[in-house]
């Protein structure tokens, strides 16, 4: 797993310290352990987890601004925990309505000592943080229009939505006349599938 992760990191053009790679592998080991009992993710094989969870999340790393970030429908902490581990400059909050997933994320925060991570258990539309977020990201939460609608109250005035998608989401964008600032095609090492990152600046809404 370590070699696969390190190779993938190089292919993504990232330069991560050894201690960050070690912490990512420790997170993956904890996820695999919990997954045997709590069924947090459908991906069971640790080698597949490297590609489908770690490298998929790491593919957006260069495109995330500094500041505060909210990961909506984070599940087991993807991409939020991965981003928090790699980017100490980010203040990351993850939120999920499923209690067992929030419990896992809290355990990961404690065991891995991720000081720049906060975990919230609850529905995003009912979440009332002390301050709005600079970036709101989702990986597999909902269609883009609903994602924006449910999180609008959480977004800073000059903030940015980042929607991680598979195929080009033209229908989602066209249905609600959303005009993204950019749609970037992402290459995930070892993954033979389309990945796109949609950039939606809050100031246009």
UniProtKB/Swiss-Prot annotation:
EC number: 2.1.1.170
Keyword Glycoprotein attached: no
A GO molecular function held by the record: rRNA (guanine-N7-)-methyltransferase activity
Primary localization: cytoplasm
Cellular component GO terms held in the UniProt record: cytosol
Localisation per UniProt entry: Cytoplasm
Taxonomic superkingdom: Bacteria
UniProt-annotated binding residues for S-adenosyl-L-methionine: 73, 78, 124-125, 139
Statement: the UniProt record of this protein carries the keyword Transport: no
Enzyme category, top tier: transferase
InterPro entries tied to this protein: rRNA_ssu_MeTfrase_G, SAM-dependent_MTases_sf
Keyword list, A-Z: Cytoplasm, Methyltransferase, rRNA processing, S-adenosyl-L-methionine, Transferase
Reaction catalyzed: guanosine(527) in 16S rRNA + S-adenosyl-L-methionine = N(7)-methylguanosine(527) in 16S rRNA + S-adenosyl-L-homocysteine
Database matches in HAMAP family: 16SrRNA_methyltr_G
PANTHER family assigned: S-ADENOSYL-L-METHIONINE-DEPENDENT METHYLTRANSFERASES SUPERFAMILY PROTEIN
Role noted for this protein: Specifically methylates the N7 position of guanine in position 527 of 16S rRNA.
NCBIfam families reported for this sequence: rsmG_gidB (TIGR00138)
The family this protein is said to belong to: Belongs to the methyltransferase superfamily. RNA methyltransferase RsmG family.
Name used for this protein in its record: Ribosomal RNA small subunit methyltransferase G
Native source organism of the sequence: Methylobacillus flagellatus (strain ATCC 51484 / DSM 6875 / VKM B-1610 / KT)
């Amino acid at each position: 797993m370590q070699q696969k992760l390190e190779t993938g990191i190089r292919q993504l053009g990232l330069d991560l310290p050894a201690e960050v790679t070690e912490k990512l592998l420790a997170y993956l080991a904890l996820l695999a352990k919990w997954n045997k009992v709590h069924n947090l993710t459908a991906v069971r094989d640790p080698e597949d987890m490297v590609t489908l969870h770690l490298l998929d999340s790491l593919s957006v790393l260069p495109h995330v601004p500094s500041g505060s970030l909210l990961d909506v429908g984070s599940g087991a902490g993807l991409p939020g925990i991965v981003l928090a581990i790699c980017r100490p400059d980010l203040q990351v909050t993850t939120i999920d309505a499923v209690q067992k997933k929030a419990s896992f994320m809290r355990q990961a925060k404690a065991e891995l000592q991720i000081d720049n991570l906060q975990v919230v258990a609850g529905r995003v539309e009912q979440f009332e943080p002390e301050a709005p977020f600079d970036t709101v990201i989702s990986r597999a939460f909902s269609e883009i229009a609903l994602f924006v609608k449910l999180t609008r109250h959480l977004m800073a005035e000059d903030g940015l939505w980042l929607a991680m998608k598979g195929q080009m989401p033209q229908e989602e964008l066209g249905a609600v006349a959303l005009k993204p600032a950019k749609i970037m095609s992402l290459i995930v090492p070892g993954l033979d599938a389309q990945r796109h990152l949609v950039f939606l600046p809050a100031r246009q809404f």
